[in-house]
Structure formats: structure tokens, C-alpha cells
UniProtKB/Swiss-Prot annotation:
One of its GO terms (cellular component) is basolateral plasma membrane. Anion-selective channel permeable to small monovalent anions with ion selectivity for chloride > bromide > nitrate > iodide. Forms a homodimeric channel where each subunit has its own ion conduction pathway. May conduct double-barreled currents controlled by two types of gates, two fast gates that control each subunit independently and a slow common gate that opens and shuts off both subunits simultaneously. Assembles with the regulatory subunit BSND/Barttin for sorting at the basolateral plasma membrane domain and functional switch to the ion conducting state. Disulfide bonds: none annotated. Residues 507-687 are cytoplasmic. This is Chloride channel protein ClC-Ka. It comes from Oryctolagus cuniculus. It catalyses: chloride(in) = chloride(out); bromide(in) = bromide(out); nitrate(in) = nitrate(out); iodide(out) = iodide(in). Ca(2+) binds at residues 259, 261, 278, 281. The gene is CLCNKA. InterPro entries: CBS_dom, CBS_dom_sf, Cl-channel_core, Cl_channel-K, Cl_channel_volt-gated, ClC. The lineage of its organism: Eukaryota, Metazoa, Chordata, Craniata, Vertebrata. CDD domains: CBS_pair_voltage-gated_CLC_euk_bac, ClC_1_like. Keywords: Calcium, CBS domain, Cell membrane, Chloride, Chloride channel, Ion channel, Ion transport, Membrane, Metal-binding, Repeat, Transmembrane, Transmembrane helix, Transport.
Length: 687
């Protein structure tokens, strides 16, 4: 029953709900409502986006800090248990392995039972969404809890599994951004806008990185490089504003909790500012970049191959389909057993956390020179003042432990990436790169113990600077991004190695991008997610191939004057999601697009008229309310493959019709583009 409506006394005749008249204090409530409307208008005069973006940054900072706060205590509890359980090797081994195995099993089982979209990094799927593909339920807020709980359990394993949180945090941030975007449309009464939604998603991705590393600048640039091929300058301020709010709040919480005296960088370094490196060292930094580029190609190939193997192998694929927690437990058992400190873990600094790994690798002292004449002890517990002692072994030396660490973490990280649970893979890659740089820096410090003479001034070589460059170069090569150089500077708060680090990153990217797809693109390929192959920089002569060579010519058109029986015949004989609407069967002039679902619904409503024997055509259905979409963009048969590819990337298109003098002559979608690019990159053998 509709609510009765009356007239307010003394009013001009505008109707008012009787509930408002009969409610208590009607004038007071009207005044409060009017005041709120006035406040809303004043606040939103500067743009409502500011408030939602600030809310996004603050929320993600609170979540990130709360997760770090809780996980720090869980990890300390594990270390306490391992330390206090006694001298029995069996008990110590069980305390070291059972703890992460239980957490990983729960993480995999819980997250996968709630939603299958919560596993993995999340960035490959987000990249697919931002390219125009709709992945149902992937950004639903119900996935948020599963991702948070699963990620917390993953991170609680510490450095045993050697996994991070960048990717999942980007996914979490984007989910909140999508939710806030829906709240925004309801608050201001605006219709949903696809482009506006994408703007919020891009800002959310930047906030995810910024609230992990407290690095707003590199957070925005990293997300632009990794997730989109084209980026609107208009979105820059949204990303930077939200990322700055998130990073500021994240570091401010550390000050409030008395962890820091003021807002500082996450990883403190002490590189000399006057002469941080000698000019001849530039060559070794570029060499380091080349080494990282080659190593990244090997890693990307092995990781993609092994991930594909787990999906094609009958035993593993069956295990993954029926019991993901069991596979996760088996993999975690292998990884935890290897890192057991009294065993193999002694030679790879397994007692250090991932944060302590970076803190020690960025140390500017040469460990090889410090241990040349003396052997530091291996204490029962890591010494906070001498954490680098964990990297030393009398027989292996510094070089042996660093090399062994790299070899073991190389394949252990590949194995960890196959575990179906929420986990990030950027920070482990960053640490591996730092170890590569540290190894080269230690070798140079031994080869040149007095430093490299340049202009009569002798300056000792700092392996920490090479570790910084290696971290940026290897992570940048794996992800095909340059912004990792800026991330390294924001993490350490120093920019004295700006040029050598950037040169190392460029050298590594030059090799990696010419040989292998990025980590995220490779994952998209293995998971068989919809994606548009990239062609920029590839010598495939895409300018010489035109649309006429690869377009789909067989298209089912619907003419305005077509009889309904003919329309029904087309619908039953094809399964297209949309159909091109032409002026007439003879002219084939493209005038619009009609969606299949809406056309079927209109035909079902028209069924009684058709049963009465009335002769009706498609034009009558369209005039009766069946909506059509205008054709805003088409391709010409003479358009090159390169131009068509750029249009699809720039506008996030899924398909376009091809017209010649207004006539619909073909159709191009991702499928046709992918086949055309594949034919150029892998041409068929000549007969």
C-alpha cells in the first residue's frame, strides 16, 4: 500500500508524506535534513572524488598496519616456541615445520572454500579487468574477508615460505575501491559510469602498493606500468592523492605506536653522500643489470613452465582439483624442511625475516673484508646488532652462502608460486635481486680492496649500493617495469645511487622485455585469461598487415525491414552476444547494434501478436522499446594491424565492426587480433 500524502499547512501545495507530518519534531527534522543537504552541497563543490579517495587510502593504511602489527606478534610467538621447546632436534624440527604447514593448509582451504578468486597474487586478473574484460564476482566485497584471512595466514609463516603481500594488497585495495565507487554513485545519485569505475580501480591499485611500502610515487607508477598499456593523465591526481593519503597514514600509525620518532623510510641505509661510487663503477652497475636481465629470463621461463606443468600433470592437477590444502601442505613441508636452521637453512640465513634480509643486504660494509682475518660466531639466536653474521659460514664463506641462497630461493620461490593461496611475489623477487647485487658487490670489494682509483681519490666499494641496484634491476626485469628504481629510493630514503640504479634497471629490462613476457603476463597466459598480445617493440611488421587480411567476414546482420521469422532464424542459428543492425538487406548500411538478450526479451513479449498472424518486422520491435546502441567507432578494411591494436588497447575495446563506405563488411575481436599477431610472430613453414 502506498503511503498517504497530504499538504503541509501554509505550504504552496507541495505534497508531503503523512509520516513526516505526524512524526515527532517535524520542523527540527526538516531543519537537520536541510542542513545536511547544504553541507553535502558545500563539501561536494570541490569534487566528491577527494573524499572517497582519502577514505580509500586511510582504510587500506589501517588494514596494512593492523595486519603487520598482528603478524609481528604471531611470528615472535613462533620464534619463542622454537627457542623454548628444548634441545631435541625432533621437537625443534616439528616446531619449525608444523607451524607453517598448518597455516598454509588453513590459508589454502579457507580462501578456496569461500571463493576461488582469492588465491594467488590477483594482479594478472586485475590487469585483465582493466583491459575491458568482465570477470564476474572477482571484485565482490565478499571476497575481501577470504583474502584478508588467507593472506594473514600466509604472511604468518614468515620467511619459511618466503612470500610477500604486494599483489594481494593491490587486489584488496581494488575491491574496496570498487565498493566505494558503488557507494559514491548512490550518494550523489549518479548513474554508473564504466570510465569512472576504472578510475577508482586504478587509484585503488596504486594505494595497494603505497600502503605496503609507504611509497606513493613508485606505487602509482608501478601500477601504471604493470596494469595498463595506456594511461590517462587525468587519473594521475587521483592515484597520487589516494596513494599519498595511504602512505602518510601508514607511517603515521607507526609514530603513534612509538615505533618511530617521525615519519621515515622503511629500510634505513647509511650510504655516504659525498662520493657514493666512483665513475668506473658505472660499468659494473650496467653489468649487474645485464646479469639480472639474464637471470630474470631464466626465472620467468622456469616459473611459467612449472606452473603450466602443475596444470597439465595428471597427478598434480587431480590433487589440485580435489584437495588443494593437501597440495599446499606438501609444498610447505618441503620448503619448511629445507629452511630448518640446524640443517640446510644454516647456509641461507633462514633465521632472518624478510625485512631483516633486506636490512642486512643493504649494509654498506664489505662482509668479505670483515671476515678475511677473523670468523664471526654463529650465536644461538640472531644478534640484532650483527644480523649479517647469519650470512657467514666458516667453510662456505660469504660468497658460498649468498650463492647457495640464490640457487635455493630460485626454485623454492617457483614452487611457492604454485600453492593455491593468497600470496604476493614481488618482495621475494626484490630480495633475490638484492642478493645478486650483494654477491657482485662483495666480489668487487675483494678484487679492489682499496677501492677503484678515480681522479686520485680512493673510495672503498660499498656492496650495499650494488644490492640496492640488483633489487631494483631484477624486480624490474621480472615485472617489466622501470619504476622499481624509484621504489628502491623510496624504501631506503636515499637517492645517491640514482643514476647507476636506473642504468642497471634499464639494462635488465632491455634484455628481459626482448626475451620473455613479464611475470604477470606469463601468469595470464598460463591461466588462459583473456588478453591482448602486445606488439610494441616487436619486429613483426604490424604496419604492413591490414584489417582486411584477418577480419571475420561471415557476420550475421539484422535489417530493419527483416521479418520477425527471419530474425528468429538468425537468433536460433547463431550464438552471438550482439548483432549489427543495418538499414536494409540490400544496402547493408550499419546504423546500430542490438544486444541478443534484449532482442530475445522483446520477441518474447511480441509472441501474442505473432500468434494472431500479424505481419510485423524488426523495425516494429525496435519502435516498441527494444534498445539499440549507436555505432561510435568502426574500422576500415585498410586500417593496419598496428593501428587496430592501439585502438583496442587505448579504449579497452573487445570488438569492432569493419565498414566500407558505411556497409558492414566484417568483424574484428581479440580472437582475430590474436590470430593475426600469432601468424606474424610464428609464421607457418613455407611449403
Amino acid at each position: 500500500m502506498e503511503e498517504l500524502v497530504g499538504l503541509r499547512e501554509g505550504s504552496s501545495g507541495n505534497p508531503v508524506a503523512l509520516r513526516e507530518l505526524w512524526g515527532p519534531c517535524p520542523r527540527l527534522r526538516r531543519g537537520i535534513r536541510g542542513g545536511l543537504e547544504w553541507l553535502k552541497q558545500k563539501l561536494f563543490r570541490v569534487g566528491e572524488d577527494w573524499y572517497f579517495l582519502m577514505t580509500l587510502g586511510v582504510l587500506m593504511a589501517l588494514i596494512s598496519y593492523a595486519m603487520n602489527f598482528a603478524l609481528g606478534r604471531v611470528v615472535r610467538a613462533h620464534k619463542w616456541l622454537y627457542r623454548e621447546i628444548g634441545d631435541s632436534h625432533l621437537l625443534r624440527y616439528l616446531s619449525w615445520t608444523v607451524y607453517p604447514v598448518a597455516l598454509v593448509s588453513f590459508s589454502s582451504g579457507f580462501s578456496q572454500s569461500i571463493t576461488p578468486f582469492s588465491g594467488g597474487s590477483g594482479i594478472p586478473e586485475l590487469k585483465t579487468i582493466l583491459s575491458g574484460v568482465v570477470l564476474e564476482n572477482y571484485l565482490d566485497i565478499k571476497n575481501f574477508g577470504a583474502k584478508v584471512v588467507g593472506l594473514s595466514c600466509t604472511l604468518a609463516t614468515g620467511s619459511t615460505l618466503f612470500l610477500g603481500k604486494v599483489g594481494p594488497f593491490v587486489h584488496l585495495s581494488v575491491m574496496i575501491a570498487a565498493y566505494l565507487g558503488r557507494v559514491r554513485t548512490k550518494t550523489i545519485g549518479e548513474a554508473e559510469n564504466k570510465s569512472k569505475q576504472n578510475e577508482m580501480l586504478v587509484a585503488g591499485a596504486a594505494v595497494g602498493v603505497a600502503t605496503v611500502f609507504a611509497a606513493p610515487f613508485s606505487g602509482v607508477l608501478f601500477c601504471i606500468e604493470v596494469m595498463s598499456s595506456h594511461f590517462s593523465v587525468w587519473d594521475y591526481w587521483r592515484g597520487f592523492f589516494a596513494a599519498t593519503c595511504g602512505a602518510f597514514m601508514f607511517r603515521l600509525l607507526a609514530v603513534f605506536n612509538s615505533e618511530q620518532e617521525t615519519i621515515t623510510s622503511l629500510y634505513k641505509t647509511s650510504f655516504p653522500v659525498d662520493v657514493p661510487f666512483d665513475l668506473p663503477e658505472i660499468f659494473f652497475f650496467v653489468l649487474l643489470g645485464a646479469i639480472c636481465g639474464v637471470a630474470s629470463c631464466a626465472y620467468l621461463y622456469c616459473q611459467r613452465t612449472f606452473l603450466a606443468f602443475t596444470k597439465t600433470n595428471k597427478l598434480i592437477s587431480k590433487l589440485m582439483a580435489t584437495s588443494k590444502p593437501l597440495y599446499a601442505a606438501l609444498a610447505a613441508t618441503v620448503l619448511a624442511s629445507i629452511t630448518y636452521p640446524p640443517g640446510v637453512g644454516r647456509f641461507m640465513a633462514s633465521r632472518l625475516s624478510m625485512r631483516e634480509h633486506l636490512d642486512t643486504l643493504f649494509d654498506n660494509h664489505s662482509w668479505a673484508l670483515l671476515t678475511r682475518n677473523s670468523s664471526p660466531p654463529w650465536p644461538a639466536e640472531p644478534d640484532p646488532q650483527h644480523l649479517w653474521w647469519e650470512w657467514y659460514h666458516p667453510r662456505f664463506t660469504i660468497f658460498g652462502t649468498l650463492a647457495f641462497f640464490l640457487v635455493m630461493k630460485f626454485w623454492m620461490l617457483i614452487l611457492a608460486t604454485t600453492i593455491p593461496m593468497p600470496a604476493g611475489y614481488f618482495l621475494p623477487i626484490f630480495i633475490i635481486g638484492a642478493a645478486i647485487g650483494r654477491l657482485l658487490g662483495e666480489a668487487l670489494s675483494v678484487a679492489f680492496p682499496e677501492g677503484i682509483v678515480a681522479g686520485g681519490v680512493i673510495n672503498p666499494i660499498m656492496p650495499g649500493g650494488y644490492a640496492l641496484a640488483g633489487a631494483a634491476a631484477f624486480s624490474g626485469a621480472v615485472t617489466h617495469s622501470i619504476s622499481t628504481a624509484l621504489l628502491a629510493f623510496e624504501l631506503t630514503g636515499q637517492i645517491v645511487h640514482a643514476l647507476p640504479v636506473l642504468m642497471a634497471v634499464l639494462a635488465a629490462n632491455a634484455i628481459a622485455q626482448s626475451c620473455q613476457p613479464s611475470f604477470y603476463d606469463g601468469t595470464i597466459m598460463v591461466k588462459k585469461l583473456p588478453y591482448l598480445p602486445w606488439i610494441r617493440g616487436r619486429p613483426i611488421n604490424s604496419h604492413r598487415v591490414i584489417v582486411e587480411h584477418f577480419m571475420r567476414r561471415a557476420i550475421s546482420t539484422l535489417a530493419r525491414d527483416a521479418a520477425l521469422e527471419q530474425v528468429v532464424k538468425v537468433l536460433t542459428s547463431t550464438d552471438e552476444a550482439e548483432y549489427p543492425l543495418v538499414e536494409s538487406t540490400e544496402s547493408q548500411l550499419l546504423v546500430g547494434i542490438v544486444q541478443r538478450a534484449q532482442l530475445v526479451q522483446a520477441l518474447q513479449a511480441e509472441a501474442p501478436a505473432r500468434a494472431s498472424g500479424q505481419q510485423r518486422c524488426l523495425q516494429d520491435i525496435l519502435a516498441g522499446g527494444c534498445p539499440t546502441e549507436p555505432v561510435t567507432l568502426t574500422l576500415s578494411p585498410e586500417t593496419s594491424l598496428h593501428q587496430a591494436h592501439n585502438l583496442f588497447e587505448l579504449l579497452n575495446l573487445r570488438s569492432l565492426y569493419v565498414t566500407s563506405k558505411g556497409r558492414a563488411v566484417g568483424y574484428v575481436s581479440w580472437v582475430e587480433l590474436e590470430k593475426a599477431i600469432s601468424a606474424l610472430t610464428n609464421p607457418p613453414p613455407a611449403k
